[in-house]
Amino acid sequence: NEHLALFDFLLQQLRQHHIKVIITPIAWWGSGYPAPDPAEPGFAVPYSKNQMNEQPKAIAAQHRYLQQLMAHKNLDGVSYAKDPNIVAFELFNEPKHAKAEPVTDYVNQLIATMRAAGVTKPLFYNISEQGNWPEFADALCASNIDGIAYQWYPTGLLKNSSIHSNVLGSVASYHNPFADIAKCQTKAKMIYEFDAADVAQTVMYPAMARSFRSAGFQWATQFAYDPAVLAASNAEYNTHYLNLLYTPGKAISLLIAGEVFRQTPRQAKLPAYPASNQFAHGSLQVLLNQAEDLALLDSGDKFYHSNSTTTAPKQPKRVAHIAGVGSSPLVQYQGSGAYFLDQISPDLWQLEVYPDVLTLQDPFQNSSLKRQVATLYAPSRTMTIDLASLGQQFYWRKVADGKNAAESSAQ
């Protein structure tokens, strides 16, 4: 199975890069998007989404599939059931249920199958795909499921053009329609996918991460990162657009969001919008400025900005990691690509600079591999770096393989 082999390779790469994984083993769709699906032999092919949880043969096939998949061994010879890099499983991607009553038994059967296959990790099930349906949520939370999975698309999907207005107010807080269902309050909570769709601004991800933590979420997955080979056309799923090369400001924004999510306590109390655009927890300080299209993080050793800023870090001598687009009091740079400065030792820093990007047209139009929404180019640029440990004079050396730190000597 070439697809499973590729998936094993992906899991290996994620593990090597210290990226933890939640797997959703059952997904109901073909492989043709955006073209029509080809004829395929999958066990879900004869059934609709509703029938997947109604037809006995479809349910039995799911049980066999889960047993086999959990027993499958990755490239390190460890079964999926026991892989320490997999932290949880979400059983079914975006299921559809016609009736609430059978949900508890159906989900419990899936859980029993996973436990019999040796899985001891937390198990999640989607609660939000059905919409605001409290009877379904009650039936789901009456099951033995460990956690419930939500989504968030506050700007909608598939507008087919960019949203230019200020939509920070729409992510000032996360509304959980099932917060009053007592059975659901003991469950773990994850966001299985989220995005500010059709928005090119760089301020949304940190705001969403802040709101997730305030609502008590323990995991959140952005949907979806565009592979560089397709990002010039944004033909993957046109309502989303995120890539370090082609949307550098949004990529830095997601980097900031990760810090916000990890450093903000669950159930943290937040001020109402617009005061929520500036917040702090411990050493973490974040500023969101829609007018300047700027997300800024200052946490002492980290200084990240998604666009040019005149704001200086509070403790410039402590800064050891810089990620930015444009200029700041520490780095003057006129290029449009992202750059990263990381301190390796007291007088040794590593600098990564990515190409400039020029946007050619609205990236959120209909998908097509024939159009080009952005292009990369690498003109000659000047960069001025003002770091205390480097002083006014330092030496640099290009690193051909891109892995070893550039050598510098402060004087």
List the predicted regions and their residue ranges.
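Substrate-binding cleft of secreted/luminal carbohydrate-active enzymes
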Residues: 202-276
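Glycoside hydrolase catalytic-domain groove-lining segments
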Residues: 134-198
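Catalytic cores of secreted or luminal carbohydrate-active enzymes
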Residues: 250-311
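Flexible loop residues that form catalytic
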Residues: 94, 153, 225
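Extended non-globular C-terminal regions
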Residues: 291-411
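Conserved beta-strand positions
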Residues: 91, 125, 150, 191-194, ...
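Active-site mouth of glycoside hydrolases
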Residues: 1-145
